[in-house]
Amino acid sequence: MAKILVVDDSPTEIHVLQTILEKNGHEVVVADSGEAGIEKAKETMPDLVLMDVVMPGMNGFQATRQLSKQSETANIPVIIVTTKDQETDKVWAKRQGAKDYIVKPVQEKGLIEHVNMVLSS
């Protein structure tokens, strides 16, 4: 299926997302910070990025903006996956270049529906 980069500083969240995605046939690459996510995206050229927001250093909004502004990664869609559930956060994510927004905790069916929707657009 697709190669998906998961960017999250929580090993538990990475494990949950990786398990769901691999169970559904996707190849998963991981990074534990916004900075590492940008570098990993350049190295692996994933089909999609799942990006946490609250991380030390560069947050997920900043990393998403960087990915959307760099020519080599600008066409890689990003889905924000976060505990932040405010409408202002969702609007801000879109302004930074995110294609979709999922609130944690994720459920397998919902995650896969969002992933498939973004990958098919």
Show where each model-derived region lies.
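Helix N-cap/capping motif at the beta->alpha junctions
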Residues: 30-39, 60
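Short amphipathic alpha-helix used as the core "switch/output" element in two-component signaling
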Residues: 39, 61-74
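A Lys-centered signature of the CheY-like receiver
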Residues: 104
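Receiver (REC) domain active-site loop signature in two-component systems and cognate sites
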Residues: 55
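Two-component/phosphorelay signaling modules centered on CheY-like receiver
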Residues: 11-29
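Active-site beta3 strand of CheY-like receiver
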Residues: 44-50
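Alpha4 helix (beta4-alpha4-beta5 surface) of REC/receiver domains from two-component response regulators
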Residues: 15-18, 62, 85-100, 109-113
